[in-house]
Amino acid sequence: MSEILKNDVDPIETQDWLQSLDSLIREEGVERAQYIVEQVIGQARTSGVSLPTGVTTDYVNTIPVAEQPAYPGDHAIERRIRSAVRWNAIAMVLRSQKKDLDLGGHISTFQSAATMYEVCYNHFFKAATEKNGGDLIFFQGHAAPGMYARAFLEGRLTEEQMDNFRQEAFTDGLSSYPHPKLMPEFWQFSTVSMGLGPVNAIYQARFLKYLDNRGLKDTKDQKVYAFLGDGEMDEIESKGALTFAAREHLDNLIFTISCNLQRLDGPVNGNGKIVQELEGLFTGAGWEVIKVLWGSDWDKLFAKDTSGKLTQLMMEVVDGDYLTFKSKDGAYIREHFFGRYPETAALVADMTDDEIWALRRGAHDSEKLYAAYAKAQNATKPVVILAHQVKGYKIPEAESKNTAHQSKKMSYESLKGFRDFFELPLTDEQVEKLEYIKFAEGTPEYEYLHGHRKALNGYVPARRTKFDVEYKVPALEEFKALLEEQPRGISTTMAFTRALNILLKDKNIGKTIVPMIADEARTFGMEGLFRQVGIYNPHGQNYIPSDRDLVAYYREAKDGQVLQEGINELGATASWLAAANSYSVNNQPMIPFFIYYSMFGFQRVGDMMWAAGDQLARGFMVGGTSGRTTLNGEGLQHEDGHSHIQAGIIPNCITYDPSFAFEVAVIMQDGINRMYGEKQEDVFYYMTTLNEVMDQPAMPAGAEEGIRKGLYKFETVEGKKGKGHVQLLGSGAIMRHVREAAQILANDYGVTSDVFSAPSFNELAREGHDAARWNLLHPTETQRVPYVAQVLADLPTVASTDYVKGYADQIRAFVPSKHYHVLGTDGFGRSDSRANLREHFEVDARYVVVAALSQLAKEGTVSNQVVADAIAKFGLNVDRINPLYA
């Protein structure tokens, strides 16, 4: 750009244009001015004028003073309530610290956000009613002490509970952060670790729209609020779904980002401006951005700033300096902020240093915040409020310091100073004892506190533990077609699809089934659902799909049932979690079935799945194309041999690796019954399915209980008497090789084999350890026998799966025989035929036979030479590298 264009060559003409715009705004309003400016910009582009993108605005409040609505609250009473909440939050954390239990705790985050939350508690947060689920609030995890402090003032928590903050093992304590598992009637959503709150809030807002558009629940009056930290926005999960929210027109979604400019160790962007960065990000993603940066004290300064230097200065100052200013004093701010320009220095010439120090950031001003939230209520797109605040507000040891996040203590003098600033009704002795503040019934504060919550339907947060609407669980007989022998081979994935179709057609619960796919429907043979129930899209289908002439064409509809999530496992899991919590959040039980490549589930979104356990989710995760050797051509990053290990660490995740179609049916019916039947258990299911076609026999009589528990005898293959007897366990893809091995053992070696299907080694291990624990603690009582020991005999045993050896090895302690050998697929996957891969990982029928003979040799039934001869006969390379290291 030339030097001429960098400077204003005709200031008078420029001033004329600006005055014309001011006149237009004054006479015809902001909307008309916006329209005219857009037309001018359009004409400029048409005429070849190069324009900046313009995704950020000046570092000032978005809402002009003239457009601020009147504040509906009583400032004096609200300040007294807010101050009491502030104190109780600090007192709770400090009282727990006195016990010397190394409990930790955070006092700075809530102090910076207290005004923000209190404005919402008094004027916006709606609780649930019988007809309406209320607003859904994702509270910032580190601000949890403030929510406890308010609930204590409301009489919903006791002093004993407050004193047991972060002490939950043996007392009625309060969890460190929002954890529904630990406080099931209080917290609705898990928001830690950081980043989970934003993405889950987006998909929760989307699921409300889904319910409404499908006519299942009227959610139009509900909002989803998410309170986040500016440091938290560095998490990929925080940013990854922003464009999705705009695409879905989630006008029911409100983010509030606490822009205290600090993360855990220091500034978020000390050399820049995180507010501007976030504004550009959200504006570009299609959100409405409302900046609340400066309190009402600044309004008179802006009004006096005819030169525009104050706004210029605010744009020039970087975040590192803003943090330093609030860690110093008024004199420092006068010199190092206002003193940068004569014009800005003149603005505060008649102000004392104390008055300068008292100038507030926007997030500490109720009127500015109320204006922002009021504007957000009527938005036509998702909204983000960027609220400028001071971390550790009014805590001398923490205020705006890099150590603020780690501040867990306050001196007696600091506590007295805090009391004095907030005018708390506490004596010096009460301050020293950290006594809690409560309002007596009948006081103005008590009546105001409860009156405003009653006007908003009740108290938040609060969580429903069970749904109370009628829900009829289908009987196993409804899956009869899958319990019988199949006329031709099918994969267990196809069996799942058929079972899903049975559920979709169920007249009682069909509408509550939520099929979810991460852009792989055709891989799983599920494209028929596109036409059958449609793909959900809030905008319908405004184009003619290229495959419209096909039976299974890509049909999108506003009331579509399938949630097609695209290539987006994290978002799809967040979507699943929203549906899996609908029973609690909406009193509307929904059964989500999310099917995906099993390698891209728990491994990719493990933190989200742990949160699903915490949130007491109910639903099905289906790991398709599972097993290390089954998705044979895709190679190392696609072949799953360990998802059951990862799923098994989540206590309320029930996992299965079925071998047969009838097992799939039993597992699905059992899961629905446990989660949505009379008991309403807080569990969710993980089931792996195969893309390998196999023969599908009929279910053996009486096998249901064994399938559910994880082990049952499938068949016995008779050999010759006296030649040996083994037990062969298998699951999933390797079950066919186990059955083949049983035939070889009988035909070639005369060995009898009891073949067991083991749909869940995880469930077997849990039950076994539970029995072992009981036995340990009850030495004088009749000892319990683990289920594995009840089912298996004291015979040489071999377990074979398409997963790492650790999966089947979990039950070793409960197997009656000391001769127990496990085959598995430890090591990196690779591409080849299934036969070659199973040879590579040493899990095919030949290795099962050799392992069985080896165990027989150990008990003396056959000689070691028999084993050696079998190895030679099968051509096994005994000198090749262990596949674990290959």
Swiss-Prot record:
Keywords: Oxidoreductase, Pyruvate, Thiamine pyrophosphate. The keyword Oxidoreductase applies. InterPro entries: PDC_E1_N (IPR035807), PDH/Transketolase (IPR051157), PDH_E1 (IPR004660), PDH_E1_M (IPR041621), THDP-binding (IPR029061), Transketo_C/PFOR_II (IPR009014), Transketolase-like_C_2 (IPR055152), Transketolase_N (IPR005474). Pfam families: PDH_E1_M, Transketolase_C_1, Transketolase_N. Its cofactor is thiamine diphosphate. SUPFAM superfamilies: Thiamin diphosphate-binding fold (THDP-binding), TK C-terminal domain-like. It catalyses: N(6)-[(R)-lipoyl]-L-lysyl-[protein] + pyruvate + H(+) = N(6)-[(R)-S(8)-acetyldihydrolipoyl]-L-lysyl-[protein] + CO2. GO terms for molecular function: pyruvate dehydrogenase (acetyl-transferring) activity. The keyword Acyltransferase does not apply. Its EC number is 1.2.4.1. Component of the pyruvate dehydrogenase (PDH) complex, that catalyzes the overall conversion of pyruvate to acetyl-CoA and CO(2). Homodimer. Part of the PDH complex, consisting of multiple copies of pyruvate dehydrogenase (E1), dihydrolipoamide acetyltransferase (E2) and lipoamide dehydrogenase (E3). This is Pyruvate dehydrogenase E1 component. It comes from Haemophilus influenzae (strain ATCC 51907 / DSM 11121 / KW20 / Rd). The gene is aceE.
